[in-house]
C-alpha cells in the first residue's frame, strides 16, 4: 500500500498549506457527554483542558473533532460566547431532529495575506470549506452511522463515513468505515508541524476498524487501516495506530504510536502529548518522532514539536500563542524549521466566531517559502 507523505513546507497557496494556514478553527468545545445529540464543527483540545473534560464529553467522535453532542452544543452556545442572544425557540439548537437523526454544519470564510521573501505578496478572499454532518442513531446510544462531507469549495469530498457500536456498559466500542486516525492532539490547525509531519490530520482519514475504551479517567483507541489516507489499497500491508490518554481535572497526559507497512518503506511514528490548566491559561504540548523508510535516499528520522498557550482573558475571547519546531532530517545539520503564531479568537454570540492572527516562519535561508509571513482573518459560522 502507499501512504500519504505530507510535506511540512509544500505550498503557500489556499489549496493545501495555505488553506490550513488560514486557521482551521471552530468555536466549539471539546466537552460533552456521550449523549449522541450533536451539532456541527470540529473543536479545539484546549477547550477540554480548560474544562477538565475528555474529547468524548463533547464530541460524537471519541477521539475528538467533527460533530458535537447535546452537551457540547449547549456549552458552545451558553458558555463560550461573550453574549447569548435569546430567541423565540422553545429550546436551544442541538442538531437533534428526533431521537434517531441529527444534523450539523460549518462554514469558514477567510481573508489572508502571504508575504514570501523575494516574491510578490498576495492577499485573497476564500471560502475555506463548507462541511455537513449527519448522524443516524439506529439504536440510540448504542448503534450509530455517521457521515462528514465537505461540500464546498469544489466537488464534494467524504471525510468520514463509519458505523459504531457501543457495548452495553458504554465503556467499549467498535467502529468501522472511513475515519480520522487516533494520534496525538486533535488540533484544529492542520498546518501545525506535528500534524503535517505525522501525516495524521483532518485531511488524511483512512479506511478500517477501530476499537475504543472510555472510562472515567482513560481514553484509548486502536485502529487498523489501509494506510492509504483514504486512497485505493495497493498491497497487503496495513497501518496500526493507537492513542491513550489519562485525564484529570487540571491536567492530562498521553502517548501515541503508529506503524504503516508499505512496499516503498515502513513509516513509524511515536509521540507524547499533554495539557495543563494554570488559572485562565490552558497549555498544550506535543512531541513526535518519525522514522520513514520511504524516501529515495533511504531512511529519515524526524522530530516535530508544539507548545501552545491559550489565555481565556475574558468571556468569548481567547488569545493563542504557539511555538513549533520541525527537524526534517536528523542527519542534516542546520535544516530545522520553526513557526510562531499569535491568534485572537472572538465568539461574540452563539454560532459565530471571528479569528485574526499572524504566523511567522523561520527556516533555512535558501528557502524563501520557509521564511514567509502570513496573516489572516476568518469568519466561522457553525450549527
Regions found by a protein language model. Give the residues of each.
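Outer-membrane beta-barrel "beta-signal"
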Residues: 54, 346, 371-383
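Transmembrane beta-barrel strands of outer-membrane/channel proteins
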Residues: 60, 105-111, 147-151, 176-178, ...
Amino acid at each position: 500500500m502507499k501512504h500519504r507523505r505530507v510535506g511540512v513546507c509544500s505550498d503557500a497557496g489556499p489549496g493545501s498549506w495555505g488553506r490550513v494556514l488560514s486557521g482551521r478553527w471552530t468555536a466549539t468545545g471539546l466537552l460533552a457527554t456521550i449523549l449522541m445529540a450533536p451539532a456541527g464543527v470540529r473543536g479545539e483540545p484546549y477547550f477540554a483542558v480548560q474544562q477538565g473534560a475528555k474529547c468524548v464529553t463533547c464530541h460524537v467522535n471519541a477521539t475528538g473533532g467533527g460533530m458535537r453532542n447535546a452537551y457540547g452544543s449547549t456549552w458552545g452556545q451558553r458558555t463560550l460566547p461573550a453574549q447569548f442572544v435569546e430567541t423565540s425557540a422553545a429550546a436551544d439548537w442541538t442538531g437533534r431532529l428526533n431521537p434517531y437523526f441529527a444534523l450539523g454544519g460549518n462554514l469558514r470564510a477567510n481573508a489572508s495575506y502571504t508575504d514570501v521573501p523575494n516574491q510578490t505578496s498576495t492577499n485573497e478572499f476564500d471560502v475555506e470549506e463548507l462541511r455537513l454532518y449527519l448522524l443516524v442513531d439506529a439504536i440510540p446510544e448504542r448503534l450509530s452511522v455517521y457521515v462528514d462531507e465537505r461540500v464546498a469549495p469544489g466537488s464534494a469530498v467524504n471525510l468520514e463515513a463509519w458505523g459504531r457500536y457501543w457495548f452495553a456498559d458504554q465503556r467499549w466500542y467498535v467502529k468501522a468505515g472511513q475515519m480520522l486516525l487516533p494520534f496525538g492532539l486533535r488540533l484544529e490547525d492542520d498546518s501545525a508541524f506535528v500534524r503535517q509531519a505525522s501525516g495524521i490530520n483532518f485531511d488524511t482519514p483512512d479506511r478500517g476498524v477501530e476499537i475504543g475504551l472510555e472510562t472515567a479517567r482513560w481514553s484509548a483507541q486502536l485502529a487498523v487501516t489501509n494506510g492509504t489516507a483514504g486512497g485505493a489499497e495497493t498491497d497487503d500491508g496495513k497501518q496500526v495506530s493507537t492513542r491513550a490518554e489519562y485525564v484529570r481535572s487540571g491536567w492530562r497526559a498521553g502517548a501515541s504510536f503508529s506503524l504503516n507497512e508499505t512496499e516503498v518503506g515502513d513509516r513509524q511514528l511515536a509521540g507524547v502529548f499533554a495539557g495543563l490548566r494554570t488559572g485562565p491559561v490552558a497549555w498544550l504540548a506535543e512531541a513526535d518522532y518519525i522514522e520513514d523508510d520511504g524516501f529515495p535516499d533511504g531512511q529519515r528520522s524526524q522530530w516535530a514539536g508544539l507548545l501552545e498557550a491559550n489565555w481565556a482573558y475574558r468571556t468569548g475571547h481567547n488569545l493563542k500563542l504557539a511555538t513549533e519546531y520541525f527537524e526534517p532530517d536528523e542527519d542534516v545539520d542546520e535544516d530545522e524549521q520553526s513557526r510562531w503564531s499569535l491568534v485572537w479568537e472572538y465568539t461574540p454570540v452563539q454560532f459565530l466566531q471571528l479569528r485574526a492572527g499572524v504566523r511567522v516562519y523561520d527556516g533555512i535561508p535558501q528557502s524563501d517559502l520557509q521564511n514567509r509571513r502570513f496573516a489572516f482573518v476568518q469568519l466561522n459560522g457553525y450549527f
